[in-house]
Amino acid sequence: MALLIAWVCVAVSIEKALGGQGDGGDLYSENITRILDKLLDGYDNRLRPGFGGAVTEVKTDIYVTSFGPVSDVEMEYTMDVFFRQTWTDERLKFGGPTEILRLNNLMVSKIWTPDTFFRNGKKSIAHNMTTPNKLFRIMQNGTILYTMRLTINADCPMRLVNFPMDGHACPLKFGSYAYPKSEIIYTWKKGPLHSVEVPQESSSLLQYDLIGQTVSSETIKSNTGEYVIMTVYFHLQRKMGYFMIQIYTPCIMTVILSQVSFWINKESVPARTVFGITTVLTMTTLSISARHSLPKVSYATAMDWFIAVCFAFVFSALIEFAAVNYFTNLQTQRAMRKAARAAALAAALSAATVPAEDEIVSHSDSNCNLKKRVNSVTSQADQSPEASIVSNSASQCQPVSAPPPAPPAPPPVGGTSKIDQYSRILFPVAFAGFNLVYWVVYLSKDTMEFFEPTAMHLRNDHQSN
């Protein structure tokens, strides 16, 4: 019996406890509802906190969930962020069983919020899937935390003088649209070093390295007052790998190929012509393709200078062959004219020696006839040694012929031109020297660009708004 009574008492206690918890939960919800109703009773969301009195301070910080891509052609970048704002509204102080009221986005439209806008933003999107991505909390002392998830497409002015060894500081500027400095000021909630967070996994870019970010604040003046502008600079350094593979290496190889023609025989005109024209066309194609990924700027970039010098080397190699061919033909023509003059002179000399030869032949014939007559007179006499000598002399009398003229010397052919010999040394040395100077200058240079718009630009923007 006693055991039964004990079990009944335990059951009653458990039932009371469960009933008390349910009543307590309902009571808690009712208390929160009363607190919210009391906070909104007489609340005017058209007036900022401290209207007509103290300045409203809005503390901000940014958490970047995704950075990129960066467009060089459009000079803009895109990022996905959690944009947090914190301020104090004395009208929303409360007391009760909880220290923080964690509310959804429906409460946002019922209270005052800062009119923050991004000054250099081209397009900003507030995410609404599956519900508006907004976080709203109210602390007992009236401090409000308001967080939004945004995708921001912002302008990033770039000066591409050092492209592709360039670096850029892409700004993100924001501030109040309508409230001047006398009513709203912005500050960094966690200080200048930790107010903007960019995790390593959020900054994986194809053509850039995000090397860091800095923050600053400034005050600009306009006809409607002074406004506080908060700025975040994202420091981007361009990666060289793509351009080394697609532009620089082909240009260097094309220049080297153009210099191979210096080692080809100067008489091989078709081969050297093909080398020259092919390399010039290749450089033209490379220069056109290099500009496809760039905006149409009016100044020359570092890559433009490199391509221009490579094009000059290739074109100079073609001009060098034209000079070699010209001087070779000129030398050949001179040799042929010299040979022709020598042949004409030899022919003239040959013609001048013909009468003398005829005279010699006639004298020889007369002597021979005289000797024949002498021999015939003495033929009847007794033969003496002297007669036999005269007879032998007569038998040896023959016509004398002049030697033929020497043929003209042929024009010189073959050999290596002195221009080719000098070019084999000067062209490679000059190109190697250019590369040494080019890479030392640009790789050791601080190419990070900063763009600071003037107050006049900001003033005109605000007046247009």
Curated annotation (Swiss-Prot):
Gene3D superfamilies: Neurotransmitter-gated ion-channel ligand-binding domain (2.70.170.10), Neurotransmitter-gated ion-channel transmembrane domain (1.20.58.390). 4-aminobutanoate binds at R84, T147. Residues 265-270, 326-424 are cytoplasmic. Residues 1-19 form the signal peptide. One of its GO terms (cellular component) is dendrite membrane. One of its GO terms (biological process) is chloride transmembrane transport. Residues 392-415 are annotated as: Disordered. Expressed in brain, in cerebellar granule cells. The chain crosses the membrane at residues 244-264, 271-290, 305-325, 425-445. Glycans are attached at N31, N128, N141. GO terms for molecular function: GABA-A receptor activity; GABA-gated chloride ion channel activity. Alpha subunit of the heteropentameric ligand-gated chloride channel gated by gamma-aminobutyric acid (GABA), a major inhibitory neurotransmitter in the brain. GABA-gated chloride channels, also named GABA(A) receptors (GABAAR), consist of five subunits arranged around a central pore and contain GABA active binding site(s) located at the alpha and beta subunit interface(s). When activated by GABA, GABAARs selectively allow the flow of chloride anions across the cell membrane down their electrochemical gradient. Belongs to the ligand-gated ion channel (TC 1.A.9) family. Gamma-aminobutyric acid receptor (TC 1.A.9.5) subfamily. GABRA6 sub-subfamily. GABAARs subunits share a common topological structure: a peptide sequence made up of a long extracellular N-terminal, four transmembrane domains, intracellular or cytoplasmic domain located between the third and the fourth transmembrane domains. This is Gamma-aminobutyric acid receptor subunit alpha-6. It comes from Gallus gallus. The lineage of its organism: Eukaryota, Metazoa, Chordata, Craniata, Vertebrata.
